[in-house]
Structures are given as C-alpha cells and as structure tokens.
Amino acid sequence: KPNKDKKISIICYNYPPGEANLFGGAFLDTFVSVSQILQRLVQEGYTTKALTPEELREVFTAGRAVNSGKYDCNWEGMIRYSTRNYHAPKEVTEHWGKAPGEIMAEEKEFLIPGVEVGNVLIGLQPARGRDSDQEQSYHDKTLPPHHQYIAFYQWLREEFRTDAVIHVGTHGTLEFLKGKESGLSQDCYPDYLIYDLPHFYLYYCGNPSEAVVAKRRSYAQIISYQPPVFEESDLYGQYLELSTEVDNYHQSLALSPAMAEQTL
C-alpha cells in the first residue's frame, strides 16, 4: 500500500482526565514531538498536514476534545462509535454493566476524543477507570478495561481502519491491562486490543523495565528518547533580588552591624 493511502493513529495521554493534563509524557514535550511526527509523515508522502505545537494544543483545548472534561466537553465535536458495532468479552459487561456504560458515552454511542488530520488520527488514550479511582486503577492488572476503552481501540481497527499505531511518551496503560505477563492470548486485554496492528512506542530510555513490559505485552517496537539536556540556570526576577539582598546583608554584618539590622 502506498504511503498516501496508509492510515496512522497517534495516541497521546490525558492522565488524570481533563483539560489540564493533555499530552502527558515523561521527559518529553509531546506537543512538539507530535508536530515533528506530522511533518515527517508529510515529507514521506502520507495524506495529512503539519500542525505546529500551538495549533495542536488549540485543537484539543479550544475544541475540548478531552477525556471527561472538568469544565466543559464538546460532545458534538467528538468522534462517535455506535454500540451496534461494538463487541467485548463477557467479563467487561459483568464488571462495568451494559454497554456503553457511564464513561465517555452518550445514549448508545461511545465518544472518541481525537481529531482526524487527513489519514492521521491524533487521539487520547481512554482513562483507565472512573475519575474517583484513576490513581488506583492505573497499574491495576485485575481490573478489566471499561467499555469505552475497548471501543476506542476497536474503532481504530474497524472504523478508522488504521494501518499502524504510535503511542507517544512514557507511558500509557495498554501494556498494563489484565492478562498474562508473557505468552499472551486473546483472553489477555493487551492482545485483544492491539492484536496484529503494527505498534510503535516512544519510550523514555531511563525506564527500560517498563519499556520491556510494553514490548512483551503489547508487541511494541520501542523507539527510545533521551531526557532533556540539563543546563545551568541563572537567577531571575525576585530570586535575583533576594540573592542581592542576602549579599548586602552579609557585607553589612562585616562593615556595619547596625545597617545589617536595617536590611532585615
């Protein structure tokens, strides 16, 4: 298939859910990274367009395409996936109730937070659980994913018909879903959701232990990235003023203790 006909899904994170935590990723400026990925895809002949980091941020914040927005949610702007096309293991219904459930759903449709830029989908990985138990459920390997989580990856495969998935940054939750540690089967949720899709994962090089989990449990091709370069920083603003006052105080102690008291 020529590049111009291929569809790519770029998946970013929104943890905890809401407007304040878009495009999270350890030691990574994810908006800049996704912008550069789009530029490279355009150069390689994919049907999409380049967006600046500022344009990407505007698309998701002004468009309110987020997981369970705390201030407002643009339900009309969400991609929708009908429950008529949805299928899930029995265990999911037993735990979360009848589809579509209460998380990112409206009537008989799932809400998919993301934008299509030509043949490229830039989406947000679903939250792991309800707002009240996000931290507890993040690495919980006994909790089955909720309906909208499963619907998100089904939509990528069956409706959007993606040719590859790229998870951007450390780290998401797909690789920590319920199932065996190795030798996964279709009864294991990472396998059930990613199955045979080509999967690329941008992962921080300082976290090889969890990168191995992503490789083993979600069949990811790991693309390592380095942390930002550390640089010496000068004082600025009130910190600079405070440093000057401290220096003046110590000089006054030696020359005129009375003036030192006035400095305090």
Residue ranges and their predicted role:
Residues 1, 104-109, 149-154:
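Short alpha-helical segments and helix-capping/turn motifs at coil-helix boundaries
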Residues 2, 47-55, 257-261:
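Flexible, glycine/charged-enriched surface loops at secondary-structure junctions
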Residues 2-4, 112-116, 157-159:
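Solvent-exposed alpha-helices and their adjacent loops that cap or buttress functional pockets
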Residues 5, 117-119, 218:
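Sequence-level motif detector for i,i+2 pairs with an aromatic at +2
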Residues 7, 255, 259-264:
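Non-catalytic accessory regions outside enzyme or core folds
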Residues 13-124:
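Extended, H/D-rich, highly charged conserved domains that either
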Residues 21, 25-49, 121-125, 132-254:
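Catalytic or ion-translocation cores adjacent to nucleophile or general acid/base/metal-coordination motifs
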